[in-house]
Amino acid sequence: MRACNTLLPTAIVLTSCDALSAHRAQIMNVATSDLISPIESTVQDDNYDRQLRGFYATENTDPVNNQDTAHEDGEERVNVATVLGKGDEAWDDALMRLAYQHWFDGGKTSDGMRLIMDLPAKGEALRHPNWGKYIKYLEFVKEKKKEAADAAAVAALKRRRTYRGWYVDGKTEKDVRKIFGLPATGKAKNHPNWADFQEYLNVVREYSKVVFK
């Protein structure tokens, strides 16, 4: 009997944890979508974007239940920030950056973002509740492009250092072709490493001019 009494609370706790996990996932969807004002349901986009824009769009599709649940849904959306971030601006920014990253990875243009955020196709919309978020997205894109450019520059420097190392080590053109998986002679413009091989040749020419100047 004592064993049964011990197992019962444990089962209740595990069941509660499962329920909380499901509820937490639901709350995350609501929280992210709540940061962008509702837009018309006629805007076509993928499911993930719709979740980010409006959780209620998937929850209240029944017109009969819309009136009954509108007030409850409104209260839930209002309480989400309190439950997760307590209205913390930094928390909201973090959620928005997740959305921005998703849209950036998906190749969303400024025009595409205007559509998602229900902004006019052109011009400023300073009084629109999503205008500030749109501007922040443009800043996010600029930041990401700079990061990509910096990373590309660092990668190029590393490649040049590697190529100079091969030259100093006495590797021949045949050796390097083998490293790149290229044929021993001739052009291979369709090979994915052909451009790298051409870069290697340019680096060797530049370096040899400096060494034997």
From Swiss-Prot:
Family designation: Belongs to the RxLR effector family.
Comment text on domains: The RxLR-dEER motif acts to carry the protein into the host cell cytoplasm through binding to cell surface phosphatidylinositol-3-phosphate.
Cellular compartments annotated: Secreted; Host nucleus
Domain of life of the source: Eukaryota
Protein name (Swiss-Prot/TrEMBL): RxLR effector protein PexRD1
The keyword rRNA processing is assigned to this record: no
Signal peptide: 1-19
Species assigned in the record: Phytophthora infestans (strain T30-4) (Potato late blight agent)
Covalent S-S links between cysteines: none
Placement of sequence motif RxLR-dEER: 50-77
One GO cellular component term: host cell nucleus
Physiological role: Effector that enhances P.infestans colonization of Nicotiana benthamiana leaves.
Expression induction or repression: Expression is induced during host plant infection.
Principal subcellular localization: secreted
Protein keywords: Host nucleus, Secreted, Signal, Virulence
